[in-house]
UniProtKB/Swiss-Prot annotation:
HAMAP family: Ribosomal_bS6. Residues 96-122 are annotated as: Disordered. GO terms for cellular component: cytosolic small ribosomal subunit. GO terms for molecular function: small ribosomal subunit rRNA binding; structural constituent of ribosome. This is Small ribosomal subunit protein bS6. GO terms for biological process: translation. It comes from Herminiimonas arsenicoxydans. NCBIfam families: S6.
């Protein structure tokens, strides 16, 4: 079995479906004997360029270990899911379980937002 990192971008109007999509893809991997090493929901972010006249989209990253057939099934699911705008699969040398630099940035932004809301208005 090989290690893969999959990043997919979901239409912003379908953001409420993201948890169900993550569970579906995790279920596909585990049902076929694979392992999900890391799941990161990066949230709604600004895209580098417009896709279907959209400036923002919901980003998700999965690090999995699976065989080629499972990967093909997941990628086929992406192609037939209209909510998925783009996806990218990268073969990795080993399993990545530590938070990605992108997730660290998301956590830092969330901490800054919560700190601003907790500060009393003067």
């Amino acid at each position: 079995m090989r290690h893969y990192e999959i990043v997919f971008i979901v239409h912003p109007d379908q953001s409420e479906q993201v948890p169900a999509m993550i569970e579906r893809y995790k279920g596909i991997v585990t049902a076929r004997g694979g392992v999900v090493h890391r799941v990161e929901d990066w949230g709604r972010r600004q895209m580098a360029y417009l896709i279907q006249k959209l400036a923002k989209a919901h980003y998700v990253c999965l690090n999995i270990e699976c065989d080629g057939e499972t990967l093909t099934e997941i990628e086929t699911g992406f192609k037939f899911n209209d909510a998925v705008l783009r996806h990218l699969t990268v073969k990795m040398k080993k399993a990545e379980t530590a938070p990605s630099p992108m997730m660290k940035a998301v956590q830092k932004e969330d901490a800054a937002k919560s700190h601003r809301t907790e500060a009393p208005a003067a």
